[in-house]
UniProtKB/Swiss-Prot annotation:
One of its GO terms (biological process) is translation. Keywords: Ribonucleoprotein, Ribosomal protein, RNA-binding, rRNA-binding. InterPro entries: Ribosomal_bL9, Ribosomal_bL9/RNase_H1_N, Ribosomal_bL9_bac/chp, Ribosomal_bL9_C, Ribosomal_bL9_C_sf, Ribosomal_bL9_N, Ribosomal_bL9_N_sf. One of its GO terms (cellular component) is ribosome. PANTHER family: 50S RIBOSOMAL PROTEIN L9 (PTHR21368). The keyword Ribosomal protein applies. Binds to the 23S rRNA. GO terms for molecular function: rRNA binding; structural constituent of ribosome. It holds the Pfam family Ribosomal_L9_C. Belongs to the bacterial ribosomal protein bL9 family. It comes from Helicobacter hepaticus (strain ATCC 51449 / 3B1). The gene is rplI. This is Large ribosomal subunit protein bL9.
Length: 147
């Protein structure tokens, strides 16, 4: 019996592979547990179509991330904060503040994507890493000024 594996099965194969198994093992274990599906032409074609659609979506998402990277790297965000002596900020710049400032420039992303190497506690120019996903990282320029 030929089956299409719906998940990785140790000692048999990886998800998406078509493997030959004994009828009892295929019917009573793999198919019964939802680990595989009988490999008919219809099932194989449906699976391949799903794979193509997933690849197209991933490519589209990657293109959007590349565009977002270009937008982020072309920006210089200016944040105005209250300062004390020696241009020291009251508090520090947070990821949330950076995310909100980015939204003003029509760049919407979650604060968890922003990485601040060291706490920003004084005025000046800084660079912050933004991890967009799929290995795409952008460098955002920050300018912190006194209010």
């Amino acid at each position: 019996m030929k089956v299409l594996l719906l998940e990785n099965v140790q000692g048999l194969g990886k998800k998406g592979e078509i493997v030959e198994v004994k009828d009892g093992y295929g019917q009573n274990f793999l198919i019964a547990k939802g680990k595989a599906q009988r490999a008919t032409n219809e099932v194989i074609n449906k699976y391949k179509a799903q794979q193509r659609k997933a690849e197209e979506l991933a490519a589209l998402e990657k293109a959007e991330m590349q565009q977002m990277k270009k937008t982020i790297e072309s920006l210089t965000l200016t944040l105005h904060k209250k300062v004390g002596a020696n241009d020291t900020l009251f508090g520090s710049i947070t990821k949330e503040e950076i995310a909100l400032a980015l939204e003003e420039h029509k760049v919407s992303l979650d604060k968890k994507h922003i990485e601040i190497a060291q706490a920003i506690k004084h005025t000046g120019n800084f660079e912050v890493q933004v991890k967009l996903g799929q290995g795409i990282n952008a460098t955002l320029k920050l300018e912190i000024k006194a209010q």
